[in-house]
Each structure stands twice: as structure tokens, then as C-alpha cells.
Amino acid sequence: MEGEVAVIIGGAGELGGALSAGLGQAGARIVVADVGEDACKRRVEKLQSIGIQASHCVVNITERASIQNLLTESLQMTGKVDMLVNCAGLNAGTSFLDVDTNLWDKIFAVNLKGMMETCQVFIESMLKNPDGGAILNIGSVTSERPLSRVFAYAASKAGVVNLTQNIAQEFAAQKIRANSICPGFFPAEQNRKLLDEKRVENIMNGTPMRRYGSPDELVGAALLLLSKKAGSYMTGSIVYVDGGFTCSWF
């Protein structure tokens, strides 16, 4: 990925940070984009400390003007964008009857609507690239298998999978590829508060590898799907990195 530029939305977080490091170590220049200035700066410092070219831009993906500003600043800093990774996410643990419309709308605004608008803005730029571009949208195993207490999150992630495949179909002829990774259970900011002892036991019983994933274990799939060489004939692919969760019948 030498000479390529990747914008990582949600890049200051645990999963996004691992993806930023993985792509950077493969030679890409990284733009860390997240909602918090301090978190972005800390992530960039970590990346730079291991020799990765990295910069940052604060973004709120629920506001289109902020997304447009991210693209503008990224182009000013790097001259182009070859890869877009959508890794921002919001979750909340409630029973179905306790999901109110405000919570539902808030989760969908980040997980699906924000992702859709980000793809729109960046695809317009990628269409000007001679080599097109690659998009990686982070989904979830909950888009495929039901899980209690994450109803809005799961529904939004099912939308992410569908959106990704529609983008892939729409822009394949213009050399823009879109794929999705659906992680299994990776402890991160948005789900740690949901992982009580009983829930962890149930999840491990349903995961054949009987352990959580490490953020670094998403990197291989990301490199494959974003690579112009290794993933050149892959678009609309949904890759589950889940320790076997989606193939298990408990």
C-alpha cells in the first residue's frame, strides 16, 4: 500500500486504531478521523511512534458539512484518498420494549445514515481517481445472527451490509470496490458495558474458538479487502471475523 492514502473514520478507537496501524505498517498514509480531538492526537502519536505517516481530522458523521470538511482537509493534507474505512459505531443495551425512538434514531444516525453520507461524499472524490478506490464498512455478526439487548445496533448493522453490497454493485464499473467485515466479539468501548458475566458465558459457549477476538485480528481481512492486488476481484464481499460464531448452532 506504499503511496496510498487511507481515511479511517473511528480511527481513534480500539478497532479503528488497530486498522490504522495495520494499514500504516503496510505502507499507507493514514488520516485518523474521529469525533474527539484529543483521542485523534493520541492515536496519531502512537502511529507516528512506530514510523507510520499519520495525521488527523475531527469529524462528526451525523453532519454532512463535517464529512465534507473531512474530505477537503484530507485532500489538502495528502492530495488524494484511495481507501475509506468506516469504523465509527454506537451501541446501547436495552430490552426491545425499552428501545425508544430517540435512541433508535441516534444509533441509526451514526451507524447507517452517517456511513451512507460518508460513502457518498468520498465516492464523489474517488470517481476522479484513475485507479478508483476501495471502501471498507465495518458491520457486525449481529447483522446475521440475533443477539439480545442490541436491537437498534443489530438492525443498523444489517443495513450496513445491504448498503455495502448496493454500493459495490453501483460503482464496480468505475473501479470503486466496497466490502464489509463483520466482527464477532471484540471488547471495545461501545460494547464493554454490555458484557456482564452471564452474557460473556453465553457468548463464549456460542463461539467455537471460545475466546474474544483481538483488534489486531481484523487487520488481515482489512488488508485483503482493501488491497489493489490481493483484493482486486473482491467487491460486495461480507467477511465474518468471528471465531466461528456465525457457523455455530450452540
Annotated model-derived regions:
Residues 176, 212-241, 246:
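C-terminal substrate-recognition "lid" of short-chain dehydrogenase/reductases
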Residues 95-96, 100-108, 191, 203:
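Substrate-binding pocket helix/loop in short-chain dehydrogenase/reductase
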Residues 124, 169-173, 232:
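Alpha-helical segment proximal to the catalytic Tyr-Lys
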Residues 1-31:
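Canonical Rossmann dinucleotide-binding motif of NAD(H)/NADP(H)-dependent dehydrogenases/reductases
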Residues 140:
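Residue(s) in the substrate-gating loop at a strand-loop-helix junction
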Residues 119, 156, 164:
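Active-site helix of classical SDR
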Residues 99, 146-154, 166:
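Active-site loop-to-helix junction immediately N-terminal to the catalytic Tyr of the SDR YXXXK motif
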